[in-house]
Amino acid sequence: MEYRQIGRTGLQAGVVGLGCEHLDGKPYAVVEETIHAALDNGINLMDLFMPGEEVRSNIGRALAGRRDRMMIQGHICSVDLNQQYDISRDPAVCRRYFETLLRCLRTDYIDFGMLFFVDSAADYSAAFESDILEYAQDLKRRGVIRAIGASSHNPVTARRIVESGVVDLLMFSINPAFDMMPPDSELEKMIGAPGELMTGMNPVRAELYRLCEQRGVGITVMKSLGAGKLISPEHTPFCKPLT
């Protein structure tokens, strides 16, 4: 495994991380096999945004005795109040779900406390100009989270996040197709975008990446294969699938 520094944190993460959404609803044996295979092959960073207690508890159980070998991105504002993935900016609700995350994972700290799904100007205001940010900063002061991060799919909003000076880590959607899309594209439209919309690297995204480097803000990548479309002969927006 090749390792790289996560911005100004001084932490080193493997170039391949583990996204855990696919483990939701799977039996414990599958979760354990996946987590252990990741650890055994040098993966030391995982993203856990899912709010359900079952998958959180299964991951916590699988990490038992090896928690110190895996850095965790745990998301603040990710909830399942209606039995499906959802977003809440209610501080009390967010606190309850984050405390449940700690309990389910059998840990007293999360490496990266991520403000969840900050895409629009309204999202930014609700997360960064509210008690939500104060809660995250309090967690960091108490050592419950080691660093503050945020996830976004929008380069304009992501730039505001980085310029706030608050975050050490940005989780952002990056792949050869998304990097060519207009900066105000919605996630669903990006995933299904036709190839004729892609005419070169979007300068807004390029500037975001430069800004992160200048500010020492690390980037972890999501949607690297565009939900699998970029490696699919039938669904790729390019003339042939990536290999």
Task: Set out the residue ranges of the language-model regions.
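N-terminal binding-site loop/beta-alpha segment at the start of enzyme catalytic domains
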Residues: 1-74, 135, 141
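Generic structural signal for well-ordered alpha-helices
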Residues: 3, 35, 56-60, 95-102, ...
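Active-site mouth loops of central-metabolism enzymes
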Residues: 16-29, 79-95, 121-125, 232-239
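A structural motif
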Residues: 40-43, 107-110, 145, 167
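Beta/alpha (TIM)-barrel catalytic core signal, keyed to glycine-rich beta->alpha loops juxtaposed to Asp/Glu
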Residues: 118-243
